[in-house]
From Swiss-Prot:
Chain positions recorded as Mn(2+) binding sites: H128, D151, H153, D155, D232, D234
Pathway where it operates: Amine and polyamine biosynthesis; putrescine biosynthesis via agmatine pathway; putrescine from agmatine: step 1/1
Protein name as it appears in the record: Agmatinase
Keyword rRNA-binding tagged: no
The UniProt record lists the keyword Ribosomal protein: no
Gene: speB
Function: Catalyzes the formation of putrescine from agmatine.
Keywords: Hydrolase, Manganese, Metal-binding, Polyamine biosynthesis, Putrescine biosynthesis, Spermidine biosynthesis
E.C. number(s) listed in UniProt: 3.5.3.11
Taxonomic path: Bacteria, Pseudomonadati, Pseudomonadota, Betaproteobacteria, Neisseriales
Gene Ontology terms: biological process: putrescine biosynthetic process from arginine, via agmatine; spermidine biosynthetic process
Amino acid sequence: MQYSTLAGQTDNSLVSNNFGFLRLPLNFMPYESHADWVITGVPYDMAVSGRSGARFGPEAIRRASVNLAWEHRRFPWTFDVRERLNIIDCGDLVFSFGDSRDFVEKMEAHAGKLLSSGKRCLSLGGDHFITLPLLRAHARYFGKLALIHFDAHTDTYDNGSEYDHGTMFYTAPKEGLIDPSRSVQIGIRTEHSKKLPFTVLTAPQVNEDSVEETVRKIKETVGNMPVYLTFDIDCLDPSFAPGTGTPVCGGLSSDRALKILRGLTDLDIVGMDVVEVAPSYDQSDITALAGATIALEMLYLQGAKKD
């Protein structure tokens, strides 16, 4: 049977399922596939505190990824990731728009079903709140996780709200999903609490240190734990990523962020996401292109393990 939505569910979304990442054909039955990594769009932005519009992020990232699809051996890598990994795009998560509780249930269930069938998840947001249900699914499967978190904000705020894109990494340690003492936050340049023992590498620090020193600190922190990797696009300076809900000046360049990512090849990264691309604030699609490039680099990290 041919489906046009994930698992053939009724989907009334107006922003979903145009075409796949890197021009991949959409595969709406990912659980039965032979995929190594499954890309899922997550058009959810009901937890934002600033400008909305990240629900259009998956579509924008996929559209920008067309600019990357032609390069079989992506520079500076020496292989084509599509020859090393079986990657599929299963389209967008189906949930009741306007119902955050339903979203959380559907996100956890989808990721859990993929993991239990031997797949790994790369999720395209969507606002950063999507990471919390993803962490729940991954911790249930892999146990307590280390977190590598690129962002302008620590997202460790405690404002009492159940659904907020600034509270996930306050909630996740409380639920035992991540070990903050083995987790690192990169690119931070906003006020934040120091109550939780995260290793915080501020944007000025990362911009002044060598890439090698930053990578060393990340690896020293997470060690050999299973790692969840999350990249909020506002980690980048607004000159490189204006199309996001809460931009903050003084961030990382795209070049520096990519070089840091490339240094993480030997870590046990078990789940990944790219979040907070909001294309209505973008200029010439540079934020969407940054998001697509980061997502592709994440996949190359996984392909490099096949050496």
